[in-house]
Amino acid sequence: MYLSLRLVSLALCIAPLASAGNNSTPLVQACTGYSFPRVACMYRYASKMPLDFYRKASVDISNVDTYSSTEVANDDSFQQVGKATFLVWDQQRGSEILGSDPAYDIVFTISTGGHEAPVYVPDTNELWFSELGKGELHQQVISLDGDSPTISEVLTDPPLYAPSGARYRNGKIYFSAGGGNSTLEGGPYHPGIYSVDPKTRKSTIEVNNYFGWYFNQVSMPTAHTRGGSPLSHFCTLVDPRLVAHGLTFQHRPTTWILTNTVASGLVILVSSWTRDLTLVHTDAAIVLARNHGTSTVAPQVQASVYRYDPETGAVNIVDDTLHCPNGVAFSPDYKTLYLTDTDAGVPMIDPRVPLSEVPSLQYNSTNRRTVYAFDVSEDGSYLKNRRPIYTAKDFVPDGLKVASNGYVITGAGKGVDILDTTGTPLLSIQTNFTAVNMVFGGKNLDELWIVGHGAVARARLNLTGPALE
């Protein structure tokens, strides 16, 4: 009798497992109210696939595998993933983001090199971004006046070399520049944070060293404000080993926070009752910059996050746990700082290897490709409670922004992922180019502009960026 019961129990356990590979419901479905497959709903996050599925992991950074390349032999619906512009992971919240009439279009075709540091300037209704090319000193400027956007080149005075992050605040653009070169015209150039008056094109150095060491890279700035608060801004600048980018402003009492990574990244937190500015910067990009030719110097300091006080000039370390900090942004209430770790991009950092022999960036999908969240202390002086919230489904989470409602947005491979505060995917925008960074622009901050390798795109969704000062 006992043996019979054991056998029955075993049979009951095996039965569900035997049927687990047979999905009766298609993984990819039409979404109510939208055209299919342009908008595709993923059934239960496609977390249970028929057993005969396979995704090949690429090690070629020029041809990284994508989610849509997954082979799902026993579910023909999955072929629609590659045809979709929008992938909806959470039907209720994803549909709320899409709104009634979502739009996506390629506005400009540009060179296939890396493009970074998009920033919207409300004073002039312009969108600036950079080209991370060897010896490239011009910035790209898109005018949003008129019926159709136009694009032109601008040379600041002095020039900026390889900015990988930017934020706007109080009439100025704050760039995190990652280029390092002593012989390039107009130089020498060193990674750091530079401010630019978008009307006069004049640039000014804000910070460019850590006790005499070059920052590896400065990257991706972002700005935030808190209306009516007496606290100052916290500006975060992140710079991964691949490229420098990451800068954000937050209302916080009197400090700047900087991050510095072996690859790229300097985070600066600036906060003052009178100055009202906080910068966070990560420094790691020199490593990456050296691999793509925009820096001639090997990394000198470890990947870290620092606090910088603009009143005294003091720089203090606040985090050194990320391997390659890159994208950075604050939550709307400034209580959470989000950082990306793009360690899957593997650079050559050995200073003994001559610049002429430094190989291009390598890729390893088993390294970190993660978005992290940190709590910010009440006085804004340190970070705590680090936790991973998302591993990118494609490539690495590069640029990072936070919408006015708190949703986290990251450029990752051939697309942009929109997450809730826990890192759960809600919606993905699929692009036919590598999406590096993005920014909310337009007079109502309701256009998401995406820059990367080969294109500038614009998405119009029911989502807005945080207010600018």
Swiss-Prot record:
This protein's record includes keyword Hydrolase: yes
UniProt keyword list: Hydrolase, Signal
Record-linked InterPro entries: 6-blade_b-propeller_TolB-like, Oryzine_lactonohydrolase, SGL
Pathway(s) the chain acts in: Secondary metabolite biosynthesis
Signal peptide segment: 1-20
Enzyme class: hydrolase
GO MF, any single term: hydrolase activity
Family: Belongs to the SMP-30/CGR1 family.
Role this protein plays: Lactonohydrolase; part of the gene cluster that mediates the biosynthesis of oryzines, natural products with an unusual maleidride backbone. The two subunits of the fungal fatty acid synthase oryfasA and oryfasB probably form octenoic acid. This fatty acid is most likely activated by the acyl-CoA ligase oryP to give octenyl-CoA before the citrate synthase-like protein oryE catalyzes condensation with oxaloacetate to form tricarboxylic acid.
Name of the molecule in the record: Lactonohydrolase oryH
Organism, scientific name: Aspergillus oryzae (strain ATCC 42149 / RIB 40) (Yellow koji mold)
